[in-house]
């Protein structure tokens, strides 16, 4: 299962549609608090999350990392800069994308991070 955390409904729907094409199951969250509750409820195989959303930010990313150690994390943001990227990578984000994100690159990162899990059903 891939957790998609994005406050913009249109963007979240687009991301989910693209990930469905990879054959993964999806759980959605509209803000950081909902994403954290989701991680506590069911450990995802990967987390794809926006940075700037209600209850978001780098502190939220650090909390996600605490509650989901070892789970690959992909970060997307409209408000990126080199320092934010460096800080995110330092706290354990495996892939970082500025919006507008190139969907082919995003899907490539998801494939790479999920690896062999894409060959079978992802829970």
Outline where the language-model segments fall:
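Two-component/phosphorelay signaling modules centered on CheY-like receiver
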Residues: 8-27
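Acidic, metal-coordinating helix/loop segments flanking the phosphotransfer/catalytic sites
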Residues: 28-46
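Short amphipathic alpha-helix used as the core "switch/output" element in two-component signaling
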Residues: 37, 58-70
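The short loop immediately C-terminal to the conserved phospho-acceptor aspartate in CheY-like receiver
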Residues: 47, 51-54, 79
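Alpha4 helix (beta4-alpha4-beta5 surface) of REC/receiver domains from two-component response regulators
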Residues: 59, 80-97
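C-terminal output helix
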Residues: 83, 101-114
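The C-terminal output helix
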Residues: 111-123
């Amino acid at each position: 299962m891939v957790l998609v955390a994005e406050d913009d409904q249109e963007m979240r729907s687009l991301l989910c549609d693209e990930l469905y094409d990879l054959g993964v199951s999806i759980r959605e969250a509209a803000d950081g608090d909902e994403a954290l509750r989701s991680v506590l409820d069911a450990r995802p195989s990967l987390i794809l999350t926006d940075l700037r959303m209600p209850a978001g930010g780098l502190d939220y990313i650090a909390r996600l990392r605490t509650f989901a150690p070892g789970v690959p994390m992909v970060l997307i943001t409209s408000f990126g800069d080199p320092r934010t990227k460096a800080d995110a990578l330092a706290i354990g984000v495996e892939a970082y994308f500025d919006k507008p994100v190139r969907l082919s690159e995003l899907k490539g990162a998801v494939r790479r991070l999920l690896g062999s899990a894409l060959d079978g059903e992802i829970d």
